[in-house]
Amino acid sequence: MTDNSQSLSLIKCPTGIQGFDEITNGGLPQGRPTLICGSAGCGKTLFGVEFLVRGAVEYGEPGVLVSFEESAKEIIQNVASLGWNLQDLVAEEKILIDHIYVEASEIQETGEYDLEALFIRLGYAINKIGAKRILLDTIEVLFSGLENTNIVRAELRRLFHWLKQKGVTAVITGERGDKNLTRQGLEEYVSDCVIKLDQKTVEEVATRTIQVVKYRGSRHSNNEYPFLIEENGISVLPITSLILNHSVSQERISTGIPQLDDMFGGQGYYRGSSILVTGRAGTGKTTLAAFFAQATCLRGERCLYLATEESPQQICRNLNSIGLDLSPYLDSQLLQFDATRPTNYNLEMRLFKIHSWVRNFKPSLVVVDPMSNLITSGNLNQTKNFFMRLIDYLKSQKITVFLTDLTGGNVGYDNEQTEVGVSSLMDTWLELQTLRINGERNRILYILKSRGMAHSNQVREFILSNDGVDLIEAYIGEGQVLTGTQRINQILEEEAIAKRRQQALELSKRNFERKKYLLQAKIDALQMKLASQDEELEVLMLEEKEFKQTMLANRNLIKKSRHIYQNP
């Protein structure tokens, strides 16, 4: 972008309202009027007041609040519940409140009707505190006595043009009409920016939404975004990016169960990953979630546990039966529960509540137990979209998410699917099942997938006891898995067989040693006989040698005697 294009681009005024500046790419158009329209009770006045308060406190921009309906005292009392002390801001001359009473019967509809007196009053208020922002609440009261649309349009144009000349960023609230965005049906045409607030009730659940209908000089989305009025003001659900560009961690964190860590190469899950545990009722899904939550708290990190089925007290009581006490982590506020029925909020509002929890509590682990209950808050497509946005958001915040899901179907290996259909989004997927054989019901666990890490492909028997959790290698026979009593009996039988084989081996070993001893004795006797024969041979050879020497000596002696007696 060139310097010239940058200088011509629209300058925006940040509102400070949580999430709103994100969906408008920076806020409201600076130095221009913005119309906030909607039905009664949707939050128009609150939006305008927060715009002024945030500007004065966070951005150092004083503001003027002009009310045509409520008095200054009423406004101060109404917003005090949100923790805003307008009285102090007024005393510090950061905000000026001016209540202008307009009586419709006193307005004379003539060709000379204008707002010159209003301009003088507004100009004085703006100059008095050096205001950069202004709120007019509500515009209908000002023109309530006029029926000539030409006059209304002309005066609206004059009012908006005058506000632009003053260089203030203006927010004007307006009541929604029957067929138009406003009662007059004119305000939206002369406004540079139009924001529509709405309140909808679907299946007895009310949801407030906000929509940017018009924004001159700026790109904007036409989508409706849910918002909530909280204890500290308005919060708009931020946009979840559809671009998969979040960073990932190489750090591994414990599952809270040493034997389960071993199934993941002794290191556990990846931090910031998504984990899914599926299984039928009673297989131990909540138990795995609770041990992971405990491991998180033991590291000094925070865990947010979203329970959609049981109360926190019931969850903690049930976990005490397997020796898991979560009360220390609740007392230290490392663990927080948010237990609400799915029917309390629709999916958009629930997603917004989770955003709010994450923003304020800053957990490193979020548990949703169970996720399958949320299907009652919407159809399958809406529920899948909800979890897709939730997982993407938590991953972008480097927060690990642990989901449990109740699956149905027959017992066996045919439950490798989720009703919501989010298994493809999961980095790690564990399956819990129960086997009912010979009057017993035993739990088993195995890992269906775990992206980016070596993991066991073996089945483990999942045992819950007063001492906690134990994962034992299940006996796998010909086409079946033996657990519980069958596994124990099979182990005992194998031990008995091994003992008998060992005894037979010892007997064979002793027989071999005896045979070896006898053979060795025979070998020793033969070796002695051979040695005796060797000695006899040596004696014979010695005698033969001596005989030959004697014969030679005799010959030499005879020869010598013949030589001596020979005649000369």
From Swiss-Prot:
Domain KaiC, residue spans: 11-250, 251-485
Keyword Transmembrane: no
CDD domains to which the protein is assigned, alphabetical: KaiC-N, KaiC_C
Entries under PROSITE patterns matching the protein: KAIC
Coiled coil: none
Stated family: Belongs to the KaiC family.
Protein's job: Autophosphorylates independently of KaiA.
Protein name in the entry: Circadian clock protein KaiC2
Gene name for this UniProt entry: kaiC2
